[in-house]
Amino acid sequence: WENDMDFSQFVIMFKSIYLEGFSRPQNGVRTVINLLLEKYKQVGGELRLGAGVKSIDVENSVVTGVTLDSGERIFANKVISSIGLPETMNISSEKADAPVTGNMSFTETILFFDQKPDDAGIRETIIFYNDDEKYHYQRPQTLCDYRSAVLCFPNNFDHDDYDEGIIRVTFIANFDQWNELDRPTYIQMKKEVRDQALALTAKLFPKFQANLLYHDVFTPKTITRYTGHFQGAVYGTTQKARDGRTGIRNLFICGTDQGFLGIVGAMLSGISMANLHGLMNGESA
């Protein structure tokens, strides 16, 4: 959604920000992922990396398995997809009406400093910033909307796993505009995003005089490259599949497009859908 939010996601955000507070596991979310991988292997799961799925094979509106980029076919009577609902329907061999692709995408700048934010009295773990009378939660007409941002301070959680000081700055961005740039311009505009992130940090925290050691910037194009999400859509389609079902029998969806929010939400979605449609055999599927 633009300039709006699904009510269930609003509830999650409200509780997280105002009632519970944000948290971060020691060593980051990788700790949780590693525990899940270990459990998956313990119960006999096989993890195949670097094996892209070319198509989801469907016959008579029933899923039969997948075909990999290598041409190998894997037969299965149930498939749970985490690549997004529009992306899932796009590679299904029997085409159906594709859900609307989400418009919301972002840039994120990760800044590494020789001092930690706490050294300058910065105690926050996250700041939602807006420098306009209204908050424009929508895809901008330019590469980025610098009127608002989210600033994160990973060092300020109970467990600080870093030697350097780290600040992450996120701006709302336009996928189409980034996607049209030639390579030299693309690199130059990433530098502009970094400069805007540094300028905002200096504006909000003038006492933070640390030296920048390293930085990295990802854009909507980066999101599409590493996730395959159309339009670099971080929160997926506005047409969520709450029960995980698609229009194809025994083809299920998990992750953001099933309706949960964030990294932890996506993992909980996978667990819920695997339990419901796999272990519990949620028939009427």
Listing of model-derived features with the role each one plays in the protein:
Residues 1-2, 12, 150, 203-260:
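A glycine-rich dinucleotide-binding beta-alpha-beta segment and adjacent secondary-structure elements
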Residues 1-43, 50, 226-238:
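Active-site/ligand-binding neighborhood in enzyme catalytic cores
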Residues 46-47, 51-64, 68, 217-227:
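Beta-rich nucleic-acid/ligand-interaction surfaces
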Residues 54-162:
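Mid-domain catalytic core of redox enzymes
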Residues 58, 279-285:
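Active-site-proximal substrate-binding core of FAD-dependent oxidoreductases
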Residues 80, 169, 201, 255, ...:
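Hydrophobic, well-ordered secondary-structure elements that form the walls
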Residues 115-218:
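C-terminal segments that line or cap access tunnels to active or ligand-binding sites in enzymes
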Residues 245, 256-281:
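A conserved FAD-binding loop/helix module that cradles the flavin
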